[in-house]
Amino acid sequence: MQKTLNSNNIELIQNFYAAFANANAAQMVSCYDDKITFQDPAFGVLHGNDAKKMWQMLIDKSEGNLKITYGNIKATDTSGSADWVAEYLFSQTGRKIINHINAKFEFKDGKIIKHTDTFNFWKWAGQALGFKGYLLGWTNFMRKRVRGFALRELNHYKPKQ
């Protein structure tokens, strides 16, 4: 049985990515429930304010060098998905990243309660870190190292005023 599409949740996802494309973290996180759970290969699992702060940090660190495109948005009453592409310079190496991401969402009371991004970590590591990333990007060692770095950055991040 096919689930019925929900235009309000489709619009919620569209608003999230439109805000991201315009570097508006406050508008992005207004789409999130306060009890949001976010997960991706770089940060692992983040909850609540940590998930919200991550988006502000990524936008601030991009220093205007971030291009977001999105599409293939689908949503029902309880879940949704989108495909999106982030183009940016990796802050640690200055290398160009073009990351193709699939997002899955769960909704509660008109907000996003769960957001899971998946992407090819090996390909991302190769773009971000060059030869070392291509060589080691498939290993748990590299995943843990990148995650540790990302979480340290998030823990030390102070939003721009």
Predicted regions, residues:
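Short, low-complexity N-terminal intrinsically disordered segments enriched in polar/charged residues
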Residues: 1-22, 26, 30, 149-161
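Alpha-helix initiation/capping motif
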Residues: 2-5, 44, 94
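Soluble or luminal CAZymes and related metallo-dependent hydrolases
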Residues: 8, 50, 97
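Hydrophobic pocket/interface hotspot
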Residues: 13-16, 28-29, 36, 51, ...
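A solvent-exposed, acidic/Ser-Thr-rich amphipathic alpha-helical stretch
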Residues: 26-27, 34-78
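A beta-strand edge to alpha-helix "cap/lid" segment located at domain peripheries
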Residues: 59-69, 73-161
